[in-house]
Amino acid sequence: MTEPGETTHFGYRDVPLDEKQTLVNDVFHSVAGRYDLMNDLMSGGMHRLWKDVMITTLNPPRDDTPFRLLDVAGGTGDISFRAAKASGAGFHSTVCDINTDMLEVGRQRAVERNLDDKVDFVEGNAESLQFDDRSFDAYTIAFGIRNVPRIDLALKEAYRVLKPGSRFLCLEFSSVDVPGLSKLYDLFSFKVIPEIGRVVTGDADSYQYLVESIRKFPKPYDFAEMMRDAGFARANWQVMSGGIVALHSGWRL
């Protein structure tokens, strides 16, 4: 329940807490059709390598052992498609996203890849998932949790829907930790990325928000503490590309 006057950040702006989700939805409605292309352009294709590390860490069964993945904020299906290709006959993924435009792109791509029998798409909110307790073997969220207004609620929901012995994986932008790289990274982020967004999608403002939202996301050790508060054990993280991204991991034991 939102308290009157309660605020949160939308990029560098303070906004009423109950308005952030609408603002985030507007961002992804605007960019859905070019979202994956923009990921390639913004990261120089590196996001593919980061996601491959996530799937390798997930390590889904390659035989017919049943394995249910919940891919939250999975929109266009990229993580689920990668997981499906790395899995055996028992794999099934549910992509849960609050944005209908992103989901529609994902459904179309699942059909194109002949993966619509292994990956389904449902509209839902990370803060109040519609799934039963202890119903999934793994939970993934890639470059999505920083857009959730109440991250603590999303983490508690992730814990709730996971079976005991199952893993939570979160791939998210982080804090550059290589001397000299941070200034170049800031220049690219604040000057180049919004301009790429303007040229490719006609929307520089959405990418300005995305850059700002990265800077507002908690440091890895703070996010690990939030995971522990939600109940996760063995919370840790793996930094990649000089700190540009981190893969966060935790277990429901």
Curated annotation (Swiss-Prot):
Disulfide bond residue pairs: none
GO terms of molecular function: 2-methoxy-6-polyprenyl-1,4-benzoquinol methyltransferase activity; demethylmenaquinone methyltransferase activity
The reaction(s) this protein catalyses: a 2-demethylmenaquinol + S-adenosyl-L-methionine = a menaquinol + S-adenosyl-L-homocysteine + H(+); a 2-methoxy-6-(all-trans-polyprenyl)benzene-1,4-diol + S-adenosyl-L-methionine = a 5-methoxy-2-methyl-3-(all-trans-polyprenyl)benzene-1,4-diol + S-adenosyl-L-homocysteine + H(+)
E.C. no: 2.1.1.163, 2.1.1.201
EC class (word): transferase
Example GO BP: methylation
UniProt keyword terms in alphabetical order: Menaquinone biosynthesis, Methyltransferase, S-adenosyl-L-methionine, Transferase, Ubiquinone biosynthesis
InterPro entries reported for this sequence: SAM-dependent_MTases_sf (IPR029063), UbiE/COQ5_MeTrFase (IPR004033), UbiE/COQ5_MeTrFase_CS (IPR023576)
PROSITE patterns reported for this sequence: SAM_MT_UBIE, UBIE_1, UBIE_2
Pathway linked to the protein: Quinol/quinone metabolism; menaquinone biosynthesis; menaquinol from 1,4-dihydroxy-2-naphthoate: step 2/2; Cofactor biosynthesis; ubiquinone biosynthesis
Residues that coordinate or bind S-adenosyl-L-methionine: T76, D97, N125, A126
Function: Methyltransferase required for the conversion of demethylmenaquinol (DMKH2) to menaquinol (MKH2) and the conversion of 2-polyprenyl-6-methoxy-1,4-benzoquinol (DDMQH2) to 2-polyprenyl-3-methyl-6-methoxy-1,4-benzoquinol (DMQH2).
PANTHER family in the cross-refs: 2-METHOXY-6-POLYPRENYL-1,4-BENZOQUINOL METHYLASE, MITOCHONDRIAL (PTHR43591:SF24), METHYLTRANSFERASE (PTHR43591)
Sequence similarity: Belongs to the class I-like SAM-binding methyltransferase superfamily. MenG/UbiE family.
Protein name: Ubiquinone/menaquinone biosynthesis C-methyltransferase UbiE
